[in-house]
């Protein structure tokens, strides 16, 4: 491994020299380590651990923009990759966790992630990096839900809050550590090490699971032959659900920004999305025994309430995480790195909230009241974030983030605990996968809604500001750190920054709505204690 890494590094250095000699723009990933694209830095602080590593590396690897796919093609690529990660992985993998040993399924997913890391480490062009990241996404998509499932398999319910709190706190802390490690590796060695480092870590995880986790017998013996085994995994349901959600996401992303709401493209996307969704629901009802989302599971009151709660909190989290960084860069005029540092309050408070939520669950025993506290903090935090302006003091925006982070941390594990109090053990893997699917789905939908709100408000207010010579489309295409370069006097700059501030804070109303809805969903969850729960038959 050391020799391979050294060879990769030498190859990188050789290519850098060729670039200097020929004075050409970089055309492949290997040629890009000495360059920096500020647009790609805008969201690096929003990613956790591994995402932080690779995104930090991506800042050092720009290409000639003429070589990128067009807007439509790029939208389809990114939606396919991101949606494929959590749709193809989360829900169908819940079936794997149900019918096969969670230990071996989890180890296989980690191995797939390692393969993707190896592909990314050896990439000679950006297309190969995309392939590597997609493979990583498939493996990583089932790891989070799988971690919770493994805890459910190996710990009694009354002890799980402590372990889940540690798990969620670790995720929050990794959001800080990941980009820092990625930046250090990219600056002092090579971006390839952001991929290479995952390989020994993944190997260590597999070794620990192999030697220390007891494998539970799966239910694969119920299925006779490959046809029956494949049928158990519900390929029809997955084939209907994936394009349905992609259509919905694209419609929400494009409507009101690229196209009007009555444009035929938007209408067609909603129609196709609706028809595919109906087809998915029908397929689940006709084959309940092999359904990806069994009706008897999702229609259970606590499961449905927990799914909705997870979707709302996930949506609020991604909206705030996405836009608070933009606010720091555009309104407070700081770099992407400084914006990342200023969101530490949000991330650390999530970690503290996760630990406190775990302790509270073990002490109180009932998830619903903690979910209500979580929703209250989220709603209050998001509401306060809507008051941000150009002159907001640091004590205020730090305090607002802490309230938001505590709310997110408090509620992050409660849905997974609640469903275990009402379901049979065989249905728990499916329910937990459904919970994490809801979190990812809610995040994707609400980010699109937030983007739409931002665009609508920004276009309207910028038109009212009447800044001479300023093109609205150009501003929307410009990174948050660069918008100040588009105007040339203080009066116009003040108008532009004020417009941007109002547009960003308008997106926090979306998070506020999600927080209020999560409060309502918590009332659906039954008050059943996690202490000494009798198995459900």
From Swiss-Prot:
<feature type="transmembrane region" description="Helical">
    <location>
        <begin position="397"/>
        <end position="417"/>
    </location>
</feature>
<feature type="compositionally biased region" description="Basic and acidic residues">
    <location>
        <begin position="1"/>
        <end position="25"/>
    </location>
</feature>
<dbReference type="GO" id="GO:0005886">
    <property type="term" value="C:plasma membrane"/>
</dbReference>
<dbReference type="InterPro" id="IPR036259">
    <property type="entry name" value="MFS_trans_sf"/>
</dbReference>
<keyword id="KW-1003">Cell membrane</keyword>
<dbReference type="Pfam" id="PF07690">
    <property type="entry name" value="MFS_1"/>
</dbReference>
<feature type="transmembrane region" description="Helical">
    <location>
        <begin position="137"/>
        <end position="157"/>
    </location>
</feature>
<dbReference type="InterPro" id="IPR020846">
    <property type="entry name" value="MFS_dom"/>
</dbReference>
<feature type="glycosylation site" description="N-linked (GlcNAc...) asparagine">
    <location>
        <position position="47"/>
    </location>
</feature>
<keyword id="KW-1133">Transmembrane helix</keyword>
<keyword id="KW-0813">Transport</keyword>
<feature type="transmembrane region" description="Helical">
    <location>
        <begin position="104"/>
        <end position="124"/>
    </location>
</feature>
<feature type="transmembrane region" description="Helical">
    <location>
        <begin position="193"/>
        <end position="213"/>
    </location>
</feature>
<dbReference type="InterPro" id="IPR011701">
    <property type="entry name" value="MFS"/>
</dbReference>
<protein>
    <recommendedName>
        <fullName>Efflux pump ustT</fullName>
    </recommendedName>
</protein>
<feature type="transmembrane region" description="Helical">
    <location>
        <begin position="304"/>
        <end position="324"/>
    </location>
</feature>
<feature type="region of interest" description="Disordered">
    <location>
        <begin position="1"/>
        <end position="50"/>
    </location>
</feature>
<comment type="function">
    <text>Efflux pump; part of the gene cluster that mediates the biosynthesis of ustilaginoidins, dimeric gamma-naphthopyrones isolated from different fungal species.</text>
</comment>
<feature type="transmembrane region" description="Helical">
    <location>
        <begin position="430"/>
        <end position="450"/>
    </location>
</feature>
<keyword id="KW-0812">Transmembrane</keyword>
<feature type="transmembrane region" description="Helical">
    <location>
        <begin position="339"/>
        <end position="359"/>
    </location>
</feature>
<feature type="glycosylation site" description="N-linked (GlcNAc...) asparagine">
    <location>
        <position position="501"/>
    </location>
</feature>
<feature type="transmembrane region" description="Helical">
    <location>
        <begin position="71"/>
        <end position="91"/>
    </location>
</feature>
<feature type="transmembrane region" description="Helical">
    <location>
        <begin position="266"/>
        <end position="286"/>
    </location>
</feature>
<dbReference type="GO" id="GO:0022857">
    <property type="term" value="F:transmembrane transporter activity"/>
</dbReference>
<feature type="transmembrane region" description="Helical">
    <location>
        <begin position="507"/>
        <end position="527"/>
    </location>
</feature>
<feature type="transmembrane region" description="Helical">
    <location>
        <begin position="162"/>
        <end position="182"/>
    </location>
</feature>
<feature type="transmembrane region" description="Helical">
    <location>
        <begin position="236"/>
        <end position="256"/>
    </location>
</feature>
<keyword id="KW-0472">Membrane</keyword>
<keyword id="KW-0325">Glycoprotein</keyword>
<feature type="transmembrane region" description="Helical">
    <location>
        <begin position="363"/>
        <end position="383"/>
    </location>
</feature>
<feature type="glycosylation site" description="N-linked (GlcNAc...) asparagine">
    <location>
        <position position="333"/>
    </location>
</feature>
<comment type="similarity">
    <text>Belongs to the major facilitator superfamily. TCR/Tet family.</text>
</comment>
